[in-house]
Structures are given as C-alpha cells and as structure tokens.
Amino acid sequence: MNQNLIEVKNLTFKRGDRVIYDNLNLQVKKGKITAIMGPSGIGKTTLLKLIGGQLMPEQGEILFDGQDICRLSNRELYEVRKRMGMLFQSGALFTDISTFDNVAFPIREHTHLPENLIRQIVLMKLEAVGLRGAAALMPSELSGGMARRAALARAIALDPDLIMFDEPFTGQDPISMGVILSLIKRLNEALNLTSIVVSHDVEEVLSIADYAYIIADQKVIAEGTSEQLLQSQDLRVVQFLKGESDGPVRFKYPAQDYVKELFE
C-alpha cells in the first residue's frame, strides 16, 4: 500500500522563459504534516496551485493518491478537488455573508444535504476551531486570527484528505499564531488529515512538521525531519534556517566595481 498521498515526480514548470522548477521531486506522506520552506519568490504558492490542478507543468507527474493530476479531465479534477482543502494566505472569506455561511458554502456547493444537517456540520466545524459563538458575525467583525480560523473551518467543511496551508502564520500576533499552530496539529491528528504547510516561519512550522523540504534554485536543496535539517552542514540550509543576512545567498546584488561606477 502506497503511504504517500502526494508524489511530485520530475516536475518542470516555467512562467514565460523563467524556470520556476527544474526536475523537482518530493513526496507527502498520508496522515502527516509536511512543511515546504524556502526564500521568497521561489514558487512555493505556485507548487500548491500545481498540486491543486490550477496550473499545469511543462513536464513531470503530480500524483494524488495514485492519480496523475495532469492527466485528469475537468470532471475528474473537480471530483479530486473535493478531497482537498485550501487555506489561503489572505483567508479569502466572502465578505458579504456571515461566518456561518462562509463555512456552509462548500457544503452547499458540492453536496445535496438538507439544511438542518448542514447546520449541524457547520457548527461542528466552528466548534473545532473555537468559533461556534461567532457564527453570526460578518468577516469584517472578526480579528485577523479569528478570520484565519474561520477559513480553516471552511477548509475542513467537506472532511478533505488533504489541506494545503499557504503562509498560515503571516500577520498573526503570538497568541493567534500559537492557536493556529495548535489547531493544525490537533486537527491533523483528530481528523486523520494530510497537511502541507508553506511558511517562512521556520521555528513555528518545524515545531509541528513531521517532515520538511527546503526549496531553492528551482529544486529541493534539503529534506528531512526538523532535527535532521537543523543539523545540516549545507551552507544554504544554515543561512536560511538561521536567517543570516549574508552567505550563499548574497546580501549585495551583483554589480560592477563600486569605485569605478562612482567616478565614471
């Protein structure tokens, strides 16, 4: 039995002439939290869109539970996406409907359940993230942390197999960040989810990740458990994890001789 829910094999993706990924390979194990980290601008969010079938690669395979996302028909892809939840960096709540209706939206969209059952499911999901009492509030009445939790409740509304988190800790105060960290870990275990967490917050994401990848230079440059990565001697990994300003990734953008340019 295959233990991987996601397998990315020999993936190449370009935007115009710019190569984002060149022969990228990674796996996401079922029931585990996998972190994807790397410098800004290397395409981590793009990778989530590729896994979700929103973008198509130039070559390679993206297997979701054995099915190649790149070869599915629109109808097949629609069915597969029901098994995926996405927590966007912005939360992406609908601003003109209540918190309750935001969580109910995917259930109403993808099922034919009666409203009384939908109500029970929505209240259960809101209870799981601590927001059952905020069901009637509009998104504008929620704090940033509450909005992120409401978006998480919506992401788990259909009991997906996979949840993808895009920078879930961005803009969160320490308390909200701690709550979201706890929720990701607790829900992953309680609901037997598989989670992919894209984040720049090294310490936080490594505290909950079962396995992690660091992506740079169009490919995976390091992978392993949190302990293995923290013990890495690769200078690129050390610079990224410690947040050092200079190293293999130079502080100064390449330029001609400074004195020569000043007095030209």
Curated annotation (Swiss-Prot):
It is a peripheral membrane protein. It comes from the Bacteria. SMART domains: AAA. ATP binds at residues 38-45. Residues 6-242 form the ABC transporter domain. Signal peptide: none annotated. GO terms for molecular function: ATP binding; ATP hydrolysis activity. Its EC number is 7.6.2.-. CDD domains: ABC_Org_Solvent_Resistant. The complex is composed of two ATP-binding proteins (MlaF), two transmembrane proteins (MlaE), two cytoplasmic solute-binding proteins (MlaB) and six periplasmic solute-binding proteins (MlaD). Belongs to the ABC transporter superfamily. MlaF family. Part of the ABC transporter complex MlaFEDB, which is involved in a phospholipid transport pathway that maintains lipid asymmetry in the outer membrane by retrograde trafficking of phospholipids from the outer membrane to the inner membrane. Responsible for energy coupling to the transport system. This is Intermembrane phospholipid transport system ATP-binding protein MlaF. The gene is mlaF.
